[in-house]
Amino acid sequence: MQKLTILGATGSIGASTLKVIEQNPDKFSVVALAADSNVEKMQQLCQRWQPEYAVMANKEAALRLKMALAVLAPNTQVLGGQEALCYVATLEQVDSVMAAIVGAAGLVPTMAAVKAGKRILLANKEALVMSGQLFIDEVEKSGAQLLPVDSEHNAIFQCLPQTVQGNLGRCDLASQGVSHILLTGSGGPFRYTDVAELEAVTPEQAIAHPNWSMGPKISVDSATMMNKGLEYIEAKWLFNASRDQLKVIIHPQSVIHSMVQYLDGSVLAQMGEPDMATPIALTLSYPERVKAGVKPLDFTQVGELTFLQPDFERYPCLALAIEACYLGQHATTTLNAANEVAVAAFLARQIKFTDIARVNDSVLNQVCKQSLASGLDSLESLLELDRMARTLADEVVRERAQ
């Protein structure tokens, strides 16, 4: 029986994880559930799963949850704050940690789980975007096992040899006969929209993803293709890939979740319904496979599969992310912070959809001019840079909102 802590239990990844566990009650059990501030949802989950621990990052939310669970789940211990997140991520009885807290907030508890040598089911892409080398070094030092949950990285993982699967972050792709990793993305809801019309896009339009069911932030990132940009950075670290080895391809149907091209001309592709339960099930059970509650792909209903080159005029955020990836850690940490602020401002109707890329570009330029590439050798220094970039982004948002 594998024992789990789920960081980000009230989000879409948390829901899919619990769906897989429900399919396999003899294989997995939930020790701790953690979330940010959604008390109502957490209350329902604690009633259903009766975990040993329930943690809210927001301490006020934790107090409200504690009162609600006094009768509904009296055996569940309720804790609050970031220290509590780290505590349940490192519990001795926990084997695996689902790291699914969105954004920079997930970095510290995920890193705590890594240092504790846990099996890390990595859904929080910001952990690698913000702290790439530091994160990979800690994984190696602690002996933690790293398994990618993101559908694209999970697809790539499945298409790679076992020697690479067991050596993420340190592998040599060329020595394994790999020529290219082909990272696919749907292109979001605006792949055929006239570029001139993107300025008028509303939050409601941006979060209506054609294929996947996701939270609002990641849906906007998918519309700008910043999501693919962050995944590009993540893939660089996970698979130790060079710029020449990593390519982005738009695949509107989201049937192929990514591919690996080999030196002999072979291409291995992982295909399936666009349902996060599939990659989650694999990371939970690896190297075995278990039921995920996902219907099998019906090839007679798939129709045509199409592939396009990304248009960087339509997707400036993708271009920025690829550029930042090779500028260094200071650039990717900055871009991630600026983007979180910009997307939140867009969702709050403070800036236009096309301003997201402008905010990101402005903050990235400001930070890169300050020569901050050196000295980012600790989690604290990265978090300080993250704070600085957010402050700069807030200023740019205020300017654009006037």
Swiss-Prot record:
Keyword Endoplasmic reticulum in the entry? The reply is no
Query: So where does NADPH get bound?
Result: T10, G11, S12, I13, N38, N124, E126, G215
Q: Which residues hold Mn(2+)?
A: D150, E152, E231
Q: In which pathway does it act?
A: Isoprenoid biosynthesis; isopentenyl diphosphate biosynthesis via DXP pathway; isopentenyl diphosphate from 1-deoxy-D-xylulose 5-phosphate: step 1/6
Q: What biological-process terms (Gene Ontology) are attached?
A: isopentenyl diphosphate biosynthetic process, methylerythritol 4-phosphate pathway involved in terpenoid biosynthetic process
What is this enzyme's EC? 1.1.1.267
- Which HAMAP family does this UniProt record tie to the protein? DXP_reductoisom
Record's protein name: 1-deoxy-D-xylulose 5-phosphate reductoisomerase
- In its UniProt entry, the species of origin is given as Vibrio vulnificus (strain CMCP6)
